[in-house]
């Protein structure tokens, strides 16, 4: 079978999505696909001066866009959502090429963008304020919400388009243009989204730079977060990144919305439905090759059902379809993003055994016929205790299994990590579920019952507590 020319495919997709050739070729930043490890594009990088120019253009656009009535801004977002529907498969293919996701996940990510546009269109007629009684006779208090200004958005490689849309759709209906720094590993999808939005805006009579893209490494990110022309910066990434971004924005009295790492756990009670648990746990742990901020990383299992649970999971792991999703639609687990991610996984597994844990299954490199890519066998690791390693987030498909005797002990283990994004419990009864969902249960921003912790649903506020940053997106916030 002839190998497809993925660089040519990427160029064709970008052209079809309206990206100017000068933005996606002829540059010095080499974009490799995790599917094969080959270069699929060479894009120009931005400089600090480019960031300054982009923020200046966004400020000028803000003066005009914020004067457009909210419902009319909502019409532009509605049209953008429709354009995404028209190009859903093309954009999803680009997500798969650039981020290595399987087709269903890529299509689901674009659908999240569409759903977010639908939510924001409704909000465009509801953004208002409050009228309150005053203690002074003949007066009333009015709280009125006004557009904030240009918004900076920093996104990660694992959700290269959806997280931007969570921010962009709401910012746009509120009157705020955006300056977007995608991960330098996945800038092509950003260029495509910005191009689609720009075309929609121009067709509606708004020749304004509503979503500019700046591409580059940490220096570009620093220039963005330190720019005083951005009253708000929304940043998605690691806890380490957030610890750098937050103080930089605060130093200039800006606002930051941080969506950072997770070390998500699920509790399996002694009378849980183990077949339901198996299905939920497997995808939560191995989906996106364990590269979601909501991926399941710790499984806290009652000692009475621990052996049976591990046996069921190990059997399922041994049957996982791992490989190149571009060539095989049946694949469930695609590649890690790059060699650095693979090295991090191997280092974590070596450290786990040094700390007394045992690898039940997986952990090795998988032969997918792509020697320059990094496919791995998802690992299950039994740990006698919640060691320092288990308290860290390793962005790879490693599931640590811990045992407990009493529910209070399980919840204590669950909460005894720095991060607090998503969580789950598998109980047959409401009492355990309510205990977990209550104020003395999970300390995460998201709690699930009888389903996995991975994923998000538009309309419900997404975000976490503690070292996850405290930000909320895509919902009632």
Describe each region flagged by the PLM.
Residues 199, 240-385, 412, 449:
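ALDH superfamily catalytic-core signature
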Residues 1-139:
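N-terminal Rossmann-like NAD(P)+-binding subdomain of aldehyde/semialdehyde dehydrogenases
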Residues 1-43, 75, 79, 129-155, ...:
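Terminal low-complexity tails and localization/encapsulation signals of metabolic enzymes
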Residues 36-41, 205, 267, 368-477:
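Conserved C-terminal structural/oligomerization subdomain of aldehyde/semialdehyde dehydrogenase
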Residues 62, 66, 81-88, 92, ...:
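Structural signal for hydrophobic packing residues in well-ordered secondary-structure cores
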Residues 37, 73, 95, 117, ...:
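Residue-level signal for inorganic ion chemistry
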Residues 129-276, 330, 404:
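Rossmann-like NAD(P) dinucleotide-binding subdomain of oxidoreductase/dehydrogenase enzymes
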């Amino acid at each position: 079978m002839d190998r497809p020319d993925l660089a040519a495919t990427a160029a064709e997709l970008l052209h079809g999505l309206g990206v100017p050739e000068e933005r996606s070729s002829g540059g010095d930043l080499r974009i490799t696909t995790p599917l094969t490890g080959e270069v699929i594009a060479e894009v120009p990088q931005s400089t600090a001066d480019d960031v300054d120019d982009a923020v200046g253009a966004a400020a000028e656009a803000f003066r005009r866009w914020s004067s457009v009535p909210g419902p009319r801004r909502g019409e532009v977002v509605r049209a953008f959502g429709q354009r995404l529907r028209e190009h859903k498969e093309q954009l999803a293919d680009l997500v798969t090429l650039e981020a290595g996701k399987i087709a269903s996940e890529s299509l689901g990510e674009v659908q999240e963008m569409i759903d977010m546009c639908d939510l924001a269109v409704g909000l465009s007629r509801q953004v208002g304020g409050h009228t309150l009684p005053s203690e002074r006779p003949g007066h009333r208090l009015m709280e009125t919400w006004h557009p904030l200004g240009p918004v900076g958005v920093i996104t990660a490689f694992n959700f290269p388009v959806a997280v931007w849309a969570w921010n962009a759709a709401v910012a746009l209906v509120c009157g705020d243009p955006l300056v977007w720094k995608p991960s330098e590993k996945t800038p092509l999808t950003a260029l495509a989204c910005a191009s689609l939005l720009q075309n929609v805006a121009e067709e509606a009579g708004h020749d304004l730079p509503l979503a500019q893209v700046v591409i580059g490494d940490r220096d570009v990110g620093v220039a963005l977060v330190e720019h005083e022309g951005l009253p708000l910066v929304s940043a998605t990434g690691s806890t380490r990144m957030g610890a750098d971004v937050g103080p930089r924005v605060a130093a200039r009295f800006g606002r930051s919305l941080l969506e950072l790492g997770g070390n998500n756990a699920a509790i399996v009670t002694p009378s849980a439905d183990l077949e339901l648990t198996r299905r939920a746990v497997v995808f939560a742990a191995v989906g996106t090759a364990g590269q979601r901020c909501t991926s399941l990383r710790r499984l806290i299992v009652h000692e009475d059902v621990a052996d049976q649970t591990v046996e069921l999971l190990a059997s399922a792991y041994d049957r996982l379809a791992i490989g190149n999703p571009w060539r095989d639609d049946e694949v469930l687990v695609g590649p890690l993003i790059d060699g650095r991610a693979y090295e991090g996984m191997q280092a974590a597994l070596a450290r786990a055994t040094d700390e007394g844990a045992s690898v039940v299954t997986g952990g090795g490199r998988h032969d997918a016929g792509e020697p320059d890519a990094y496919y791995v066998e998802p690992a299950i690791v039994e740990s006698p205790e919640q060691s320092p390693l288990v308290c860290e987030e390793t962005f790879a498909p490693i599931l640590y299994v811990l045992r407990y005797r009493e529910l209070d002990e399980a919840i204590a283990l669950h909460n005894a990590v720095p991060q607090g994004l998503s969580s789950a419990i598998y109980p047959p009864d409401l009492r355990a579920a309510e205990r977990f969902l209550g104020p003395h249960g999970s300390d995460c921003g998201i709690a699930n019952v009888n389903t996995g912790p991975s994923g998000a649903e538009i309309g419900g506020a997404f975000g976490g507590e503690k070292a996850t940053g405290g930000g909320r997106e895509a919902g009632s916030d």
